[in-house]
Regions:
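Short, acidic, metal-binding catalytic loop of nucleotide-sugar glycosyltransferases
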Residues: 27-36
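Short aromatic/hydrophobic "clamp" motif used to bind/position activated sugar donors
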Residues: 86-87
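Conserved nucleotide-sugar donor-binding catalytic segment
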Residues: 119, 137-227
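Glycine-rich, basic loop-to-helix element that forms the pyrophosphate-binding segment
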Residues: 65-81, 94
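Short beta-strand/loop segment that forms part of the nucleotide-sugar
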Residues: 36-45, 63-66
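Conserved donor NDP-sugar-binding/catalytic core segment of glycosyltransferases
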Residues: 99-133
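N-proximal low-complexity "stem/linker" segments adjacent to membrane-targeting elements
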Residues: 1-28
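A conserved acidic beta->alpha catalytic loop
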Residues: 43-52, 90
């Protein structure tokens, strides 16, 4: 594939008052070995140094106006972008692997049945020190592909890493612009993952650490994120998760997998034994998750519970 034949990748970057990280994030994109890029910054009306930093990059497209959070910013970026593939990049996070975009485009062209490519994420302290993987489960084993990732989502309910996933624009538009979220400040990526799997699209994972997710002072603490993100959003995206679980476990109708054009590329049918094993895994995962939520809620009152919180985080891969 010559540089002239490379499909355009649109990098959509939501931003708000995190200018101290903007240069590092943008430079990480510009240093990619893949050069057929369009960078779109959707800024929510920052009042810090963000716009001054962005002014040093005349080649990027910047829109700065009030919005209701990352979900609205992403929707806005999708409506104006021109790329065949989409990469979402939060302004406080960045890419670690300089050939990541090239690897993803090659993977998606090699596997036309797949609609999304993603990789691992390592947390990054505000000091710049790299920490553990964002999902501890993948410290022990490589993430699965295609039907295996669908099963993993059904079991654990966790999504793709939004800081490095590259999606076919057609699929991103179909899913994201169909959302009717009760509050556009909600975490759009949990809804995206649920809708992606419910519609039958499949993904590919390149099992390398591709990006980092920064832990900073403006970010919600783990306690707040866990309580809010994993349980308050349950009314919408976990309801969809349980609906698909019931479909797979209780009906004989197979779950179909489709490509970005809607063509069927596979089916998932489980034997009675496999359904029973799968059900036990779901029950264990859900029980551990709810127990961890209870411990997180109580740990400030009972310091000893901190030990058990850390244990259960490891046991469920959070």
């Amino acid at each position: 594939m010559t540089p002239q034949d490379r499909p355009l990748v649109s990098v959509i970057v939501p931003s708000f008052n995190l200018g101290r990280y903007a240069k590092e994030t943008i430079d990480g994109v510009l240093m990619q070995t893949y050069n057929s890029l369009e960078i779109i910054i959707i800024d929510g009306g920052s009042t810090d140094e963000t716009l001054a930093v962005l002014a040093n990059y005349p080649s990027i497209h910047v829109i700065s106006e009030f919005d209701n959070g990352p979900a609205e910013a992403i929707m806005k970026g999708l409506r104006i972008c021109s790329g065949e593939f989409i990469l979402f990049q939060l302004i406080s996070d960045g890419l670690l692997e300089p050939s990541w975009i090239s690897k993803c485009v090659n993977e998606l062209q090699k596997h036309p049945e797949a609609s999304l490519c993603w990789g691992l994420v390592r947390r990054k302290e505000e000091s710049g020190e790299l920490a553990e993987l964002a999902l501890l489960r993948w410290e022990k084993t490589d993430p699965p592909n295609e039907a295996g990732m669908f099963i993993s989502w059904l079991t654990y309910g966790s999504g793709f890493h939004e800081t490095n996933m590259i999606i076919r624009k057609k699929v991103a538009l179909e899913i994201v612009l169909s959302f009717n979220l009760p509050n556009s400040k909600d975490d759009i990526f949990y809804y995206f993952t649920a809708e992606f799997h419910a519609r039958g699209y499949i993904s590919r994972c390149i099992p390398i650490v591709a990006s980092y997710s920064r832990i900073h002072s403006n970010q919600r603490s783990f306690d707040e994120m866990f309580n809010k993100k994993l349980f308050n959003y349950e009314k919408i995206w976990r309801r969809k998760l349980w609906r698909i679980r019931r479909k797979v476990l209780l009906t004989t109708k197979p779950h179909r997998f489709i490509d970005s054009n809607g063509a069927i590329v596979g089916m998932l049918e489980l034997s009675i034994k496999s359904r029973a094993i799968f059900l036990v895994k779901i029950i264990l995962s859900s029980t551990r998750l709810r127990l961890l939520n209870l411990m997180v809620t109580c740990k400030r009152r009972i310091p000893l519970l901190r030990i058990f919180v850390n244990y259960f985080r490891l046991s469920i891969g959070r």
